[in-house]
Amino acid sequence: MSKTAIVEIFNSKFPIGTEVTVQGWIRTRRDSKAGISFLAIYDGSCFDPIQAVVPAALENYSDEVLNLTAGCSVQVTGELVESPGKGQQFEIQATQVEVLGFVQDPDTYPMSAKRHSIEYMREHAHLRARTNMFGAVTRVRNCLSHAMHNFFYEKGFNWISTPIITGSDAEGAGEMFRVSTLDLENLPRNDTGAIDYKKDFFGKETFLTVSGQLNAETYACALSKVYTFGPTFRAENSHTTRHLAEFWMVEPEIAFADLADAAQLAEDMLKYVFNAVLTERADDMAFFAQRVDKEAITRLEKIVSSEFVRMDYTDAIEILQNCGKEFEFPVAWGVDLQSEHERYLAEVHVGAPVILQNYPKDIKAFYMKLNADGKTVAAMDVLAPGIGEIIGGSQREEDLVALDKRFDEMGINKEDYSWYRDLRKYGTVPHAGFGLGFERLVSYVTGVQNIRDVIAFPRAPGSADF
């Protein structure tokens, strides 16, 4: 007998009177004095469980059905009928209930039917996907991921799988995880006493990637429009709700493009994926709006219908200095903006997303194109109401002389980037791109504040469980 996903029932793909078989887990069991049990069954295909009405006449009713608790897995067959109860359109009049797996000790089951704190569920990350909260997060994350790929496919982009193991620091910040097979208790040394990485697996120092951008640029300079979507790693000893040591990045790169092109692409992308999640995951978004963040839906709707405002960094500094608000972190030209500054600009001053452009070169990465003023680079951040920065990008420096000068100014050995410099030697073109931290996007969409709660198994300082 074919199995039916619960979402297909709720989408009215089966007429009343059809015999259906569903497989899933028990959310709750309720018994009536009339000798009937009501099982709320979910299978993860949608937010709402379906109710199965189980009569006492079933052969295994007393010894199995009445022992079902939250988390038990079952297969239920029965007739699909209209539900007389409020809040549900359909239910199943069960003719067969097969128990596939009992919860061995319901009293110690970590994800029992009672409500648990986010912190508690984080300690049981291997089981938390069984809850309403994390099931909804997972489906929204999946929807956003699918929409992201669709957006770039429709725009003619090629998806590039960039390496996870790399010998280059794309950010120049040095906060990287080293990859090595050397014996830590017997490290080889060279003549100067330093560790001899020539004896290591790759014959050189290697790290987990902090960004696929530099690799993506090589393909953009051949295929014109590419993007990466994969895991990245930062060895930042940060314990905030906005940082992870392992997270996913979306990084498009476009050739024959400038900063304005990258900014427009970022705006179009955000509107596309927000519209997709509002349309395709209405049930999950309704849950987030009710239980997590009452603005979850209206925030996205407003962004989809808004024009993103372009603003120069220099103008933003002047606005912040003259707004009359006292900030925790002082504002001055040449300093990087803090979240409080970004949110003021997007939420108070503009009331819509802001694309902040043309930052001082001294606070930005080596690969960003120097502007004509010699003081700023063609960089941008997309600031969204409710979170601040959500995207960072730039036009890339396509001139080899200018790039080498930046390497020298920042004390970076340009020979380590010889392959990257080759792009400027052989048919260089203006090109631009940006990076989006995917978990930060999921957090923004769902209203879930801690970024550790929008990825299946969070990796953070002192935490690499499961």
Swiss-Prot record:
A single Gene Ontology CC term: cytoplasm
UniProt-listed Enzyme Commission number(s): 6.1.1.22
Residue ranges of coiled coil: none
Lineage: superkingdom: Bacteria
Subcellular location: Cytoplasm
GO-annotated biological processes: asparaginyl-tRNA aminoacylation
The reaction(s) this protein catalyses: tRNA(Asn) + L-asparagine + ATP = L-asparaginyl-tRNA(Asn) + AMP + diphosphate + H(+)
Matching InterPro entries: Aa-tRNA-synt_II, aa-tRNA-synth_II, aa-tRNA-synth_II/BPL/LPL, Asn-tRNA-ligase, Asp/Asn-tRNA-synth_IIb, NA-bd_OB-fold, NA-bd_OB_tRNA
Pfam families according to UniProt: tRNA-synt_2, tRNA_anti-codon
Keywords noted in UniProt: Aminoacyl-tRNA synthetase, ATP-binding, Cytoplasm, Ligase, Nucleotide-binding, Protein biosynthesis
Quaternary structure, from the entry: Homodimer.
Family the entry assigns: Belongs to the class-II aminoacyl-tRNA synthetase family.
Protein name as annotated: Asparagine--tRNA ligase
Organism for this UniProt entry: Psychromonas ingrahamii (strain DSM 17664 / CCUG 51855 / 37)
Organism taxonomic ancestry: Bacteria, Pseudomonadati, Pseudomonadota, Gammaproteobacteria, Alteromonadales
